[in-house]
Amino acid sequence: MKRILFFALLLGTLNVFAQSPAKFTETKFNFGKLKQNVPATHVFKFVNNGAKPLVIESAVAGCGCTTPEYPKQPITKGKEGTIKVTYNAAAMGAFTKDVTVKFAGQEEPVILNIVGEVIEAKPAPKKKQ
């Protein structure tokens, strides 16, 4: 009986530690088709479900064409935070870009992903005179 109780408590404890306190509404966003040289932005939202304030240590993009912005102040329990990701649509073609978000006190980062396709921007039609 003691062994069963011990293993039940152990499993419950492991489950609590495995969960991230940041609960994102989404971790992947599809921009669809974007016009070349027109930056595109998406805001990823999350809620702090943990017992302590949540601090973002870093949000790092995989390349220079993607820029993440994140709050520097702690997100208190139950409050919402956002990470704004801007993609500079300079190169034509399909793209997949990642932003790695590291929270203080968490070993595993959260990976945010944006995808889409950059198409040629059509020139404005000439006005008839």
What is the meaning of each model-derived region?
Residues 18-39, 43-45, 106-129:
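Long, low-complexity ectodomains and other extracytoplasmic segments of secretory-pathway proteins
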Residues 46-50:
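Asparagine-centered strand-capping/turn motif at beta-strand->loop junctions
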Residues 36, 77, 91-92:
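Surface-exposed loops/turns
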Residues 82-91:
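Extracellular/luminal low-complexity segments enriched in Ser/Thr/Pro
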Residues 4-16:
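Sec-dependent N-terminal signal peptides
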Residues 95-105:
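A short beta-strand micro-motif common to beta-rich folds, especially ectodomain repeats
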Residues 51-80:
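Surface-exposed binding patches on compact interaction domains or structured appendages
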